[in-house]
Amino acid sequence: MATFLSRAKRLSLSAGFLLAVGVAVAPQAMAQTITVNNNLVFGDVFPGIPKTIDKANAGTAAEFQVSGTAGNEISIDFTLPTYMNRSGYNMQLIFRETDCAMDSSATPDQSNPNYDDIDPWHTITYALGLNGVTIWLGGIVVPRLNQMNGAYTASIVLTVAYTGN
């Protein structure tokens, strides 16, 4: 069991994460809100068998909704962990250069987003749509053959800020 934190709101999720969200607001722009619509859920994992959650998998990939002033440009930064921890035991996490996707259309489509294969390790710059932007994140957990069982946690920090453009 793990936890996401979104603007002082904690949400539960399986095998995973603590999400801290930072928001910077330009004076002329409406404040962003960040909502966690779905948690990144690895579910059961087995020793020595990596498990991948694709960003397009509804119900298991993390889904975030960012709203704010339509047309304003924002920067999105993830601070991603490389391990989850449980009482001194670690389990490797991998976030690939294609593990993020976004869609700012009126009806965001996780299976066919308008901005796909995004690198979550680098700053993402994007203009908010009328409905904001929906962001999806997948990843891989890599348990060792002798991995201790139990609930592992890690922290993901998502920072969204207006760029002024």
Spell out what each predicted region is:
Residues 5, 125-127:
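Serine/threonine-rich, low-complexity intrinsically disordered segments
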Residues 29-91, 127-165:
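N-terminal small/polar-rich segments of proteins
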